[in-house]
Design a protein with these regions (language model features):
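Walker A/P-loop nucleotide-binding motif
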Residues: 28-46
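Conserved AAA+ ATPase "SRH/arginine-finger" region at the nucleotide-binding site
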Residues: 117, 132-144
Length: 184
């Protein structure tokens, strides 16, 4: 369930949710947004919320053929790119960006790092992307994890919420994964 009502808000994602909820009433010169954060932090879920509201085209894989850009966009004007990194060829994205701007549409780019920390080429694309506001979704905090676990239990009709009264300890593995252990 990737709808807005299923997206749980906490301090770790509140800024990003505020941006998405305020669309299309973004500042006048703002035609897009870069949402970044760690893996499994809710970026794609929040992107799906915006994609549904905006009727945007969603791209999860790099565009390699510049000639396909108009076909990909079809008659739409909003695009969400999920999983953007330095491996995406820049020329098709530059063409896509210009077409979105021409149609007065919006572009959301979801990435693990802020676009400014990526080596985006060509320079024209890097310059255009640098104008996008940037919002971070942080590592899920304890309150968010508690609410997500509670929702998962409720979805499975396990209604004994008393188990959430005990603190949950988190430890991080070297690869950034979270291990959960019961509290003391």
């Amino acid at each position: 369930a990737l709808g807005r009502k299923n997206f749980i808000i906490s301090n770790s994602n509140r800024d990003a949710v505020t941006w998405i909820d305020s669309w299309p009433n973004w500042p006048v010169a703002c035609n897009g947004l870069n949402v970044f954060g760690p893996k499994s932090s809710g970026k794609s879920h929040l992107g799906a919320v915006w994609q549904s509201r905006s009727k945007a085209v969603q791209l999860n894989n790099p565009i390699v053929d510049i000639m396909k850009v108009p076909e990909i966009l079809n008659n739409k004007k909003n695009v969400i790119i999920d999983g953007f990194d330095e491996s995406w060829p820049g020329i098709p994205i530059l063409h896509l960006y210009n077409l979105i701007k021409e149609r007065e549409g919006f572009l959301i780019i979801i990435s693990s790092k802020p676009l400014a920390q990526l080596e985006v080429l060509p320079a024209d694309l890097s310059s255009r992307l640098s104008t996008l506001p940037v919002v971070e979704i942080k590592q899920p905090d304890d309150e968010l994890i508690k609410q997500v676990m509670q929702k998962l239990f409720e979805d499975r009709l396990i209604a004994d919420v008393e188990i959430f009264e005990n603190p949950i300890k988190r430890t991080y593995t070297q690869d950034g994964k979270i291990n959960f252990n019961g509290g003391d």
